[in-house]
From Swiss-Prot:
Gene3D superfamilies in alphabetical order: 30s Ribosomal Protein S19, Chain A (3.30.860.10)
Name of this chain's protein: Small ribosomal subunit protein uS19
Keyword Cytoplasm annotated: no
Family: Belongs to the universal ribosomal protein uS19 family.
GO molecular function, one term: structural constituent of ribosome
Keywords associated with the record: Ribonucleoprotein, Ribosomal protein, RNA-binding, rRNA-binding
Keyword rRNA-binding attributed: yes
Organism: Hamiltonella defensa subsp. Acyrthosiphon pisum (strain 5AT)
UniProt record, GO biological process: ribosomal small subunit assembly; translation
Length: 94
């Protein structure tokens, strides 16, 4: 058995407390704001909306069952891809 299977998943304590508190208050549907991109998604988070910080703003992500055992940071991209710059058409005509 590999070492990684022996160890449990990593979740920051403050995020774990917020998830437990939100599970108690089912009527409270506000997203949980977090800066912890390194935390692993565990089954108690399913159905919650978590706002993950991407370096500039908090990106709201609805947690589904397919996301379990992934990291929160995977769902809040930090870089924006604007595409390659198109060549100047006037320069090509000359």
């Amino acid at each position: 058995m590999p070492r990684s299977l022996k160890k449990s998943f990593f979740v920051d304590r403050h995020l774990l407390k917020k998830v437990e508190k939100s599970a108690e208050n089912n009527k409270d549907k506000k997203p949980i704001r977090t800066w912890s991109r390194r935390s692993t998604i565990f089954p108690e988070m399913i159905g919650l909306t978590i706002a993950i910080h991407n370096g500039r703003l908090h990106v709201p992500v609805f947690i589904s069952d397919e996301m379990v055992s992934h990291k929160l940071g995977e769902f809040a991209p930090t870089r924006t891809y604007r595409g390659h710059v198109a060549a100047d058409r006037k320069a090509k005509k000359r």
